[in-house]
């Protein structure tokens, strides 16, 4: 069984309570078993598409896909991989906004399993705790590494940091290109989607929200 940290469990419970956790079922098989079964099923899919899996270029593709799904692009479905975070007491009494902008977002649309590519900004006003800046990037990446819809992803990031930092004063802004729009269907290569989520002072005070949006739009 995977070991889930207390911090990860708190975040998961907060998402469930708000109804914004990614729809999942309880896993009963270990990673090796899941890789093996996914590999078998992907082999069938590729054969049904008419691909020759005896070809040197394709023979390892089912294995590569299984490994990629379990260990890489969907690893965020397993809370055992949640970033290790140590809350640091705010002894310096930092009271100004802490903002991390232009965080790389690479996720997967859960409707068509193609790429979501964009940027994320996260800001908070410290109270009792602060965290290492790189941890903000890592938490964003954790939630990106699962099948996603952008609206839920944005809310998950907000709730995760509110839970970790024990403050409502968090803001999240996401701007992304969806390849389910870009490479299929309407095939619009220029459009992007913007979502945001605000808590605490960012939600209640217009000037604070304006300051945040002004900083990330420079």
Swiss-Prot record:
Entry-linked InterPro entries: GTP-CH-I_C/QueF (IPR043133), GTP-CH-I_N (IPR043134), GTP_CycHdrlase_I (IPR001474), GTP_CycHdrlase_I_CS (IPR018234), GTP_CycHdrlase_I_dom (IPR020602)
GO molecular function terms noted in the UniProt entry: GTP binding; GTP cyclohydrolase I activity; zinc ion binding
Any one of the GO CC terms: cytoplasm
Top EC class of this enzyme: hydrolase
Catalytic activity annotation: GTP + H2O = 7,8-dihydroneopterin 3'-triphosphate + formate + H(+)
A biological process term (GO) from this entry: tetrahydrofolate biosynthetic process
Ranges in coiled-coil conformation: none
SUPFAM superfamilies assigned to the protein according to its UniProt record, in alphabetical order: Tetrahydrobiopterin biosynthesis enzymes-like
Residues binding Zn(2+): 109, 112, 180
EC number: 3.5.4.16
Keyword Zinc: yes
Keywords assigned: GTP-binding, Hydrolase, Metal-binding, Nucleotide-binding, One-carbon metabolism, Zinc
Source superkingdom: Bacteria
Pfam families: GTP_cyclohydroI (PF01227)
Pathway(s) served: Cofactor biosynthesis; 7,8-dihydroneopterin triphosphate biosynthesis; 7,8-dihydroneopterin triphosphate from GTP: step 1/1
Keyword Metal-binding among UniProt keywords: yes
Subunit structure: Toroid-shaped homodecamer, composed of two pentamers of five dimers.
UniProt cross-references to PANTHER family, sorted A to Z: GTP CYCLOHYDROLASE 1 (PTHR11109:SF7), GTP CYCLOHYDROLASE I (PTHR11109)
Family under the similarity heading: Belongs to the GTP cyclohydrolase I family.
NCBIfam families referenced in this protein's UniProt entry, alphabetically: folE, PRK09347.1-1, PRK09347.1-2, PRK09347.1-3
Protein name as it appears in the record: GTP cyclohydrolase 1
Origin species: Actinobacillus pleuropneumoniae serotype 5b (strain L20)
Lineage, uppermost ranks: Bacteria, Pseudomonadati, Pseudomonadota, Gammaproteobacteria, Pasteurellales
